[in-house]
Amino acid sequence: KNVGVPEGLNIGIDNAKGEFIVFLNNDLVVKEKWLTEFFVAHKKFGDALYQPKSLKMKNLNEIDGVGNMINVFGFGFSRGKGEPDIGKYDKNIEEISYASGTCMFLPKKIINEIGIFDKTLFAYHEEVDFGWRARLNGYKSYYVPGSLIHHFGSANWGWSKKKFFLLERNRW
């Protein structure tokens, strides 16, 4: 039975035994030292939500996301999406609005404090709500350019009316 992305993440949280949690979509490839870079960032910035640099799998020179932001209308978006990767976002670890659910690293104690993912969202934008709750509880989110993944994107859904519905419904 497909219980949706947030509930699947919550099941993983319930079974996780470690001090840290990493959420990974099933349609990506992690690159060398991706996890080490998260621990380096955590040591420097402390308890927070962290996301890597994400390049498209089909075009390794195209950005999939380099930090998720919230625009003036309150909608979340992936900064840099579709831009050529020319190193513009490679210089520093930067504070962002919220970490992408494609790949997110965080201490489990944050989840214990802010709660699990909202399963009513089913798919898409669940990390916006999660990141917002983290921020309201004093936790920041950071983009870590030294941590790199290649993301296929839409491996399970492609484009469909249901995907469009979920994307639009969950934006509000």
Residue ranges and their predicted role:
Residues L28-F75:
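Conserved donor NDP-sugar-binding/catalytic core segment of glycosyltransferases
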Residues I63, F75-F77, E83-L106, A123, ...:
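A recurrent flexible, glycine/aromatic-enriched loop bordering the glycosyltransferase active site
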Residues K1-A16, N26:
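Glycine-rich, basic loop-to-helix element that forms the pyrophosphate-binding segment
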Residues V5, L24, L28-W34, K56, ...:
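Hydrophobic/aromatic residue at the end of a short beta strand that borders the catalytic acidic motif
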Residues L136-W172:
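Active-site-adjacent helix/loop segment of glycosyltransferases
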